[in-house]
Protein backbone atom coordinates (compact mmCIF):
# COMPACT_ATOMS: atom_id res chain seq x y z
CA UNK A 1 0.00 0.00 0.00
CA UNK A 2 2.92 2.33 0.71
CA UNK A 3 4.23 1.79 -2.81
CA UNK A 4 0.94 3.12 -4.20
CA UNK A 5 1.18 6.25 -2.04
CA UNK A 6 4.80 6.90 -3.01
CA UNK A 7 3.96 6.38 -6.69
CA UNK A 8 1.06 8.84 -6.43
CA UNK A 9 3.30 11.44 -4.75
CA UNK A 10 5.99 10.97 -7.40
CA UNK A 11 3.54 11.30 -10.30
CA UNK A 12 1.84 14.33 -8.75
CA UNK A 13 5.20 16.05 -8.16
CA UNK A 14 6.35 15.39 -11.73
CA UNK A 15 2.99 16.62 -13.01
CA UNK A 16 3.23 19.89 -11.06
CA UNK A 17 6.81 20.49 -12.30
CA UNK A 18 5.81 19.65 -15.88
CA UNK A 19 2.83 22.04 -15.86
CA UNK A 20 4.91 24.76 -14.18
CA UNK A 21 7.55 24.59 -16.93
CA UNK A 22 4.91 24.15 -19.65
CA UNK A 23 2.96 27.25 -18.63
CA UNK A 24 6.06 29.31 -17.77
CA UNK A 25 7.45 29.28 -21.32
CA UNK A 26 5.50 28.74 -24.57
CA UNK A 27 5.49 25.13 -25.85
CA UNK A 28 8.11 24.59 -28.53
CA UNK A 29 6.52 21.36 -29.73
CA UNK A 30 4.43 21.54 -32.91
CA UNK A 31 0.81 21.08 -31.86
CA UNK A 32 -1.77 19.64 -34.23
CA UNK A 33 -4.88 21.81 -34.28
CA UNK A 34 -3.63 23.85 -31.32
CA UNK A 35 -4.95 27.25 -30.33
Swiss-Prot record:
Keywords: Chloroplast, Membrane, Photosynthesis, Photosystem II, Plastid, Thylakoid, Transmembrane, Transmembrane helix. It comes from the Eukaryota. Its main location: plastid. The chain crosses the membrane at residues 3-23. Pfam families: PsbT. InterPro entries: PSII_PsbT (IPR001743), PSII_PsbT_sf (IPR037268). It is a single-pass membrane protein. It is found in: Plastid, Chloroplast thylakoid membrane. One of its GO terms (cellular component) is chloroplast thylakoid membrane. One of its GO terms (biological process) is photosynthesis. PSII is composed of 1 copy each of membrane proteins PsbA, PsbB, PsbC, PsbD, PsbE, PsbF, PsbH, PsbI, PsbJ, PsbK, PsbL, PsbM, PsbT, PsbY, PsbZ, Psb30/Ycf12, at least 3 peripheral proteins of the oxygen-evolving complex and a large number of cofactors. It forms dimeric complexes. Belongs to the PsbT family. Found at the monomer-monomer interface of the photosystem II (PS II) dimer, plays a role in assembly and dimerization of PSII. PSII is a light-driven water plastoquinone oxidoreductase, using light energy to abstract electrons from H(2)O, generating a proton gradient subsequently used for ATP formation. This is Photosystem II reaction center protein T. It comes from Pinus thunbergii.
Amino acid sequence: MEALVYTFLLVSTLGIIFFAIFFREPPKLPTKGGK
